[in-house]
Swiss-Prot record:
GO terms for cellular component: plasma membrane
Pfam family, one: LGT
Major location category of this protein: membrane
The protein's name in its UniProt record: Phosphatidylglycerol--prolipoprotein diacylglyceryl transferase
Family in the record: Belongs to the Lgt family.
Pathway connected to this protein: Protein modification; lipoprotein biosynthesis (diacylglyceryl transfer)
Any one GO BP annotation for this protein: lipoprotein biosynthetic process
Documented EC number(s): 2.5.1.145
PROSITE patterns for this protein: LGT
InterPro entries: Lgt (IPR001640)
UniProt keyword Transferase present: yes
């Protein structure tokens, strides 16, 4: 196949005069809206008015984006210290999920305290929504042709029985790459199904959220090992270090909260 003969998708969804609207932002926004819809439905079933989650999203999403960008810039400071004007440019990506998660959790804790609500109850309800947003959001990386893995052959990708539009989009600068965005997206969608099923098990309050953290972190650890654009700290892949830490801390929290009697309430209790 001749170089440049592979049809690819445009990163720009629509052009509004001089302003391009990128698929990356459209896809992220879609993930947020679908996650909000899922959370408000479950929240109302458990006695929390939908406006609570709408208010939370309006506050948490901008803060999560800010933290996600800050996290990314910190670990890529060698580049951004020389190109400070690019720090606020997120049209081409550059949002780190772990940073966004830190921002969202801090916001959720403060929001719950101010509203007199249980953070763990809000977190449990939001867990499937967050993972759904992450599953959808990875397709923004797909459109940007980022967050991919090592070089592979077209035959390898065809052997995965992927549709042509995915295979073609993985053709970057004359080389085909592992669609790691897809692996993580599928893992996250499977996690959403698991979390929705676990709602019926009526776990102790907070443990659905910890299950989300563990599930996502396990998948991210293995997918990260395939990526070529990992944020690094010396020889370590930051996302893998964070994933291990999150799994360990989540398990410790589950055990300690049970032993201290802080997890007596169940998911379905008001």
């Amino acid at each position: 196949m001749l170089l440049g003969s592979v049809p690819q998708l445009d990163r720009i969804a629509v052009q509004l005069g001089p302003f391009p609207v990128y698929w990356y932002g459209v896809i992220i926004g879609t993930g947020v809206l679908l996650g909000l819809w899922l959370a408000t439905r479950e929240g109302e079933r458990l006695g929390i008015h939908k406006d609570t989650f709408i208010d939370l999203v309006l506050i948490a999403v901008p803060i999560a984006i800010l933290f996600a960008r800050m996290y990314y810039v910190i670990f890529e400071w060698e580049y951004y210290s020389q190109n400070p004007s690019q720090i606020i440019n997120i049209r081409q990506g550059g949002l780190a999920i772990h940073g966004g998660l830190i921002g969202a959790v801090i916001t959720g804790i403060l929001f719950a305290k101010r509203r007199g609500l249980s953070f763990w109850k809000l977190a449990d309800i939001a867990a499937p929504s967050i993972l759904l947003g992450q599953a959808i959001g990875r397709w923004g990386n797909f459109m940007n042709q980022e967050a991919h893995g090592d070089e592979v052959t077209r035959q390898f990708l065809e052997g995965l029985h992927l549709p042509d539009f995915i295979i073609n989009q993985m053709y970057i600068d004359g080389v085909y790459y592992h669609p790691t965005f897809l692996y993580e997206s599928l893992w996250n969608f499977a996690g959403v199904i698991l979390l929705l099923a676990l709602r019926k098990v009526n776990l102790r309050r907070g443990e659905l959220f910890f299950t989300y953290l563990i599930w996502y972190s396990v998948g991210r650890f293995f997918v990260e090992g395939l990526r070529t654009d990992s944020l690094m700290l010396g020889p370590l892949r930051i996302a893998q270090v964070m994933s291990i830490g999150i799994v360990v801390i989540s398990i410790i929290f589950i055990i300690v909260r049970r032993k201290m009697g802080q997890a007596d309430k169940r998911y379905l209790e008001n």
